[in-house]
From Swiss-Prot:
HAMAP family: UPF0301 (MF_00758). Transmembrane segments: none annotated. Gene3D superfamilies: VC0467-like. It comes from Burkholderia lata (strain ATCC 17760 / DSM 23089 / LMG 22485 / NCIMB 9086 / R18194 / 383). Belongs to the UPF0301 (AlgH) family. InterPro entries: AlgH-like. This is UPF0301 protein Bcep18194_A3962.
Length: 192
């Protein structure tokens, strides 16, 4: 059994799916890890836009959104857990406090309460955010096992990839943080 000090904490890291990812849900994805502990991990897929845009989602939850640049921003598939629930990944907003927010150590915030969407609708919320439906979750030791089987690469997260890079370029951009491209990856694991 490893000591707690031996544990690697992957909070505020990107998980990048390897080509041999067997689960089609995660094939080709980049996941921002919001929390990683001995109890498990929680993250949001950041590169799978859905056909739903903010205007449609806000209409569904009876919020008026009149800020033109926001209307057609896509809502993302955040993962297969709680797909009916919204998760907002955003930069901290000075002086703002939302009902259900989690500060990610060294990084962003994730909020699940409607008040952050109300703030977005009125223009007082986070300026840089990504809204997902659902999240990715792993039980105790599950993510570590997947990483040990070469299912994921990990790298320190860069908010510019989350907020400034087009969705279809995020996978390659995240790999670029490691100095590699998808053409350099093999789906086969081996030992030297």
């Amino acid at each position: 059994m490893s000591k707690p000090s031996d544990r690697i904490n992957l909070t505020n890291q990107f998980l990048i799916a390897m080509p041999n990812m067997a689960d089609p849900t995660f094939s080709g994805t980049v996941v921002y890890l919001c929390d990683h502990s001995e109890r498990g991990a929680l993250g949001l897929v950041i590169n799978r836009p859905t056909d739903i845009d903010l205007e449609s989602l806000f209409n569904r939850i009876d919020l008026k959104l009149d800020i033109e640049p926001l209307l057609h921003i896509p809502v993302y598939f955040g993962g297969p857990v709680q797909t009916e629930r919204g998760f907002v990944l955003h930069e901290p907003v000075e002086g703002a406090s939302y009902n259900s927010s989690m500060s990610v150590e060294g990084g962003l915030e994730m909020t699940t309460s409607k008040d952050v969407l109300e703030a977005v609708a009125t223009g007082t919320g986070p300026k840089r955010f990504l809204l997902t439906l659902g999240h990715a979750g792993w039980g105790a030791g599950q993510l570590e096992e997947e990483i040990s089987r070469n299912g994921w690469l990990t790298v320190a997260a860069d908010p510019r990839i989350v907020f400034d890079t087009p969705a279809e370029e995020r996978f390659e951009a995240a790999l670029g943080l490691l100095g590699v491209s998808s053409s350099m990856l093999s789906g086969e694991a081996g030992h030297a």
